[in-house]
């Protein structure tokens, strides 16, 4: 997307997100109500909160898997994804083993994604590559390799960040590189540190096709 989206166009690309450890059932119900009001694409919640979000109704539900470290055993990630889908989620955002990517073990990264892909057949699968870490501790080829592994494993999206790592969240450089590597075959979700309308528009113009936002209302209100 190039140029300035309308409020409705931007909202339709947003996963309205709440992943804090202290999140309550009431918080998730309020998140879903706000999501329906704002007209976003989906909400993104922890696996244990999927039933609450589904019961609240009126919006698609995405769940994270292996979040936020990505260090879970692949079979655990697969089980977590399957449980979320059985509870009514339609999309899975999984975290790869970042350490495996950094040391060049792309086969391990690919097989990890394949395990979740098999458990999430028919669902949209987004693969979180923690782009700020991969770009900050190595060079561009590590991020490129991780994105290619996601594509080879059958993912639908690559996603920049958990939003939890001190290295940072989405950047224009990372989104551009990810889009150049796998777009338009895969979508690119920018997430982490997108706090203003200008941030959101910059990510879309860099090639993002979905946005993960926690402060969605403020971002939408900031559109001129």
Swiss-Prot record:
Instruction: Provide a GO biological process annotation.
Output: deoxyribonucleotide catabolic process
Which InterPro entries does this chain map to? Aldolase_TIM, DeoC, DeoC/FbaB/LacD_aldolase, DeoC_typeI
> Which GO molecular function annotations are given, in alphabetical order?
deoxyribose-phosphate aldolase activity
Instruction: List locations, semicolon-separated.
Output: Cytoplasm
The record's section on CDD domains has: DeoC
What is the role of the protein in this entry?
Catalyzes a reversible aldol reaction between acetaldehyde and D-glyceraldehyde 3-phosphate to generate 2-deoxy-D-ribose 5-phosphate.
Q: What is this protein called?
A: Deoxyribose-phosphate aldolase
What organism is the protein native to?
Mycobacterium tuberculosis (strain ATCC 25618 / H37Rv)
Gene that this sequence comes from? deoC
């Amino acid at each position: 997307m190039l140029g300035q989206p309308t409020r409705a166009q931007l909202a339709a690309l947003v996963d309205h997100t709440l992943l804090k450890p202290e999140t309550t059932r009431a918080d998730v119900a309020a998140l879903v109500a706000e999501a329906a009001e704002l007209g976003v694409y989906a909400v993104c919640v922890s696996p244990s909160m999927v039933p609450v979000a589904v019961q609240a109704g009126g919006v698609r539900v995405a769940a994270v898997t292996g979040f936020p470290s990505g260090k879970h055993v692949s079979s655990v990630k697969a089980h977590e994804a399957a449980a979320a889908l059985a509870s009514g989620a339609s999309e899975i955002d999984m975290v790869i083993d970042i350490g495996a990517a950094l040391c060049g073990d792309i086969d391990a990264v690919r097989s990890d994604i394949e395990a979740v892909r098999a458990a999430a057949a028919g669902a949209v699968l987004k693969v979180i590559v923690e782009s700020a870490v991969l770009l900050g501790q190595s060079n561009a080829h590590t991020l490129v390799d991780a994105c290619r592994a996601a594509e080879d494993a059958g993912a639908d999206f690559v996603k920049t960040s958990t939003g939890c790592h001190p290295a940072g969240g989405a950047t224009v450089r990372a989104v551009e590189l990810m889009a150049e590597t796998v777009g338009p075959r895969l979508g690119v979700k920018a997430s982490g540190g997108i706090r203003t309308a200008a941030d959101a528009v910059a990510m879309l113009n860099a090639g993002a096709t979905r946005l993960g936002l926690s402060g969605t209302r403020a971002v939408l209100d900031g559109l001129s």
